[in-house]
């Protein structure tokens, strides 16, 4: 049975800039904001919308070595994107289903609320490092790094 874990964070960046790096430019941005984890991101199939398949290749010291994800939700008007792990990554660590959905909302001109929903399932006991509490910390760290990246004028 799929379970959900929800969290949120406020970032001091414009909604449009954050949406661009989360939805369109992440193939080039992810390795820049997570250089200690991600070697590169490859577009395998699709045009960036629903059905697009990506491979996140991790550095040699990171295990597992890759994660294949599919964009399962993409709504430009509501600024919502969902990425489901379909191979490797968390699925190699005991989870049978893992999806992260980001929904952006403008708080004010230079402040954006990011709602994060993690949907997950597992067939057996899972390692502590892949519990939604732990994986959500990684997701929030990624969002903070995106905030820093955008604040430094890198986008």
From Swiss-Prot:
Trans-zeatin 1 binds at residues 22, 69, 139-142. One of its GO terms (biological process) is defense response. The keyword Glycoprotein does not apply. One of its GO terms (cellular component) is cytoplasm. Gibberellin A3 binds at residues 67, 139. Keywords: Allergen. Pfam families: Bet_v_1. GO terms for molecular function: abscisic acid binding; cytokinin binding; gibberellin binding; protein phosphatase inhibitor activity; signaling receptor activity. Trans-zeatin 2 binds at residue 67. Gene3D superfamilies: 3.30.530.20. Binds the cytokinin trans-zeatin in vitro. Binds gibberellin A3 (GA3) in vitro. Monomer. Belongs to the BetVI family. This is Phytohormone-binding protein CSBP.
